[in-house]
Each structure stands twice: as C-alpha cells, then as structure tokens.
C-alpha cells in the first residue's frame, strides 16, 4: 500500500507556509538575528498569569461549555460594545476558539459550498487561502497596492466580484503590511459589499494596535454591516498571549448556530485555564495595552525613519507591528534579497512573496523586538545594501 495514495489530494496540493519554509532554511545558520516572527516580545502580564494559576490551584481544569465560559463570552461582548458600540448576545452570538485561526477556519466551513468564491486580500496572512481551499471554496485574489497604502478601494473590489462571490476575508490592521482602513474607507467598501450581498469575515486581531491617534474602526460599526459580518478577535497580540491559544468569533445567531457545531465536533472547547486568564485580560489590561502599544509605536517610528534615511521606500504603517519596505530598486526578488540577508548578514526577515504574489519586491519586518535588536538589524541591512549599490 502506498500511503501517499491514501491521502486527500486537496491537502497534498497545499503549499507549506512561506514563512515556515523560509525560517526552516534560515535556522541552518548560526548567530542569526531574526525580525521574522509576529509574536510580542512582552511576557503575558502577571495578573493574567496569576488568574490561570489560581484556576489551576482551585482545580478548575475541566471542560467548559462548548461555546466557552459564559463569563468569558460575556466579557468579550462587553469589550466589543465598549470598543465599537455594537451589542452581541453572549449566549447565541459568541464562540471562544483556539486562537483566531480556528475562528477563520470554522467561518469558512460554515459559509462555503463547493465553488463559492471568497475574496482574499494579497498580500495577506498565510492561512487564509488554505482555509478557503480546505472548505471547498475558491480563493479570488484582490491585489492591494502600495500607492493606495495597501487599502481596499471600491474600484479594485468591484473588479474581482463575480456572481459566485460569497464572502470577503478582510484583515485590518493588516498582516503583513501594517495598513489600516479608516471609517470613510470602510464605508465606501461596505457600500459595494452590501450592493452585491457579500458576507464579510473580518479578522481584527490587531485592533488594539493602531498608531493613528484614533481608535480602530471595525467593519461592524458601519451601517448595515453588523448582521452580515463574522467578527474575529483574539488575545495573542494585544495581550501578549500567543501560547495561550485563545480567540473568539462574533456573528449573527443563524451563522453562530452552525459555527457551534463545527467547534463542538472538532475542538470540544478552548483550553479552560486560558479562558479564565482571558476573563482577567479583558477586565484588567487597559494599562498593559497602552504600555505595549506605546513601545511598539516608538519602534515603528524608528524603523520608518531609518528606512527613509537609507533611501528605501517604505509606506508608513499605522497598525499591527509590521513594516513592509519596498526593496525592488536592488534588482533582486524578495526571496533572493531575504536569503542573501541570511547568508551574508545573518539577519532573517520574511520575503513579501510569503504573503502572496503582490508581496514581490517587499519584505515583512516585525518590530515586536527590542529597540536594540532593531538597531542591530538595520545596521546589517545598511551594510548589505551598501554592498549591493557598490556592485552596480
């Protein structure tokens, strides 16, 4: 028996994550400085850890309700209403998931029938196309352009809509570009979506990390969008809780009823200790969020200025903790540039093409690292591009 003949062809055809493939190669080198991982360099705040320790000591280690702790679902809904002014029923419109990635996955499986099309922004997070494909949907790529600050425009959106379009999977603040969508931008795009009766799956995991001086605007705040949107959030980025694997989804009850089924059969419930920690995170972390956001903003400003001084075009990101410089002037592909950085400078960043074809000519650099690491990394980039310019 050939085991490869026993496997699902659709899964076999999926390509591994471009990020993981690149870092597997980079890991072969010693003394690497990495700006590649999208993970906060802060420890989970102590008061959050204490709540999990307390739950463990008290023996609260059993399954929760499939949809999640009632207390946590209530806090998610309170948090969302406080941030966006939109109400959800914690008993029928909220599910606690194993990270935001599970929420994306079950959203696609709930919505899609074979042949349904889902619009996906490119560059975009690496799991979106596989999530659509595994749910028997058809990914349709919406290129995001540097001249539009990597935002969706109504014109570009109209160009990719077909009679088969079922949904759009949006991610703002955006990974990998750091782009944000303001209220006017969203209103214009949502008019197109409403006119074509398209569902929105909005991954807003980085919603607490914006640097415009104004709060993040959610899709669900736009008139008429609350009841055609699955809103996805989580704890990994804003609360420095990546390893706790905790996220959530909010959606109208008819959609959520079906999401509960998949979550129940595939997961049972999110990790119990993580859920108790999540309750404390939502109640008591405002100062922690502000502190981390201010630190990221300092690093963001440093990188923007440094790239400008180096003569490398770099649109200014106002969200998440990534910067997306344009290195096309050097005549190397994104992957060639990134690989030579590893080989010659012992610096690991992510080639833009890991996030789709529209990432060609760009690099994704995470500033979820210390300012000292960022300075070291930019010194190495400066040394490298000086060599490239001298080669010409």
Question: How should each PLM-predicted stretch be described?
Answer:
Residues 2-7, 12-14, 22-29, 33, ...:
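PLP-dependent class I/II
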Residues 53-57, 61-66:
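Phosphate/diphosphate ligand-binding glycine-rich loop within oxidoreductases
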Residues 63-98:
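Conserved N-terminal alpha-helix of the aminotransferase class I/II PLP-enzyme fold
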């Amino acid at each position: 028996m050939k085991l490869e003949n026993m496997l699902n062809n659709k899964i076999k055809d999926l390509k591994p994550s471009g990020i993981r493939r690149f870092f597997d190669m980079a890991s072969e080198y010693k003394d690497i400085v990495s700006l590649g991982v999208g993970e906060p360099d802060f420890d989970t705040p102590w008061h959050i850890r204490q709540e999990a320790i307390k739950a463990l000591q008290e023996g609260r280690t059993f399954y929760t309700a499939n949809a999640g702790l009632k207390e946590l679902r209530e806090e998610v809904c309170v948090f969302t209403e406080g941030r966006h002014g939109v109400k959800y029923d914690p008993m029928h419109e909220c599910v606690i998931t194993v990270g935001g990635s599970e929420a994306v996955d079950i959203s696609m499986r709930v919505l899609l029938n074979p042949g349904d099309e889902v619009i996906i922004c490119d560059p975009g997070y690496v799991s979106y196309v596989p999530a659509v494909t595994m749910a028997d949907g058809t990914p349709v790529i919406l290129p995001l352009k540097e001249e539009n600050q990597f935002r969706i425009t109504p014109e570009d959106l109209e160009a990719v809509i077909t009679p088969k379009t079922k949904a759009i999977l949006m991610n703002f603040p955006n990974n990998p570009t750091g782009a944000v969508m303001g209220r006017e931008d969203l209103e214009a795009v949502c008019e197109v979506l409403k006119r074509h009766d398209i569902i929105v799956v909005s991954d807003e995991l980085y919603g607490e990390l914006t640097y415009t001086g104004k709060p993040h605007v959610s899709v669900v705040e736009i008139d008429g969008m609350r009841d055609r949107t699955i809103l996805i959030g989580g704890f990994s980025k804003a609360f420095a809780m990546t390893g706790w694997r905790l996220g959530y989804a909010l959606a109208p009850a008819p959609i959520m009823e079906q999401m509960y089924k998949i979550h129940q059969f595939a997961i049972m419930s999110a990790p119990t200790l993580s859920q108790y920690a999540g309750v404390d995170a939502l109640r008591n972390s405002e100062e922690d969020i502000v502190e981390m956001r201010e630190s990221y903003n300092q690093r963001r400003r440093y990188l923007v200025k440094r790239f400008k001084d180096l003569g490398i075009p770099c649109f200014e990101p106002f969200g998440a903790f990534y910067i997306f410089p344009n290195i096309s002037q050097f005549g190397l592909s994104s992957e060639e540039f990134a690989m030579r950085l590893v080989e010659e400078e012992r610096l690991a960043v992510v080639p833009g093409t890991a996030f789709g074809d529209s990432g060609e000519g760009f690099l994704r650099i995470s500033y979820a690292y210390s300012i000292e690491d960022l300075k070291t990394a930019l010194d190495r980039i400066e040394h490298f591009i000086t060599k490239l310019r001298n080669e010409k």
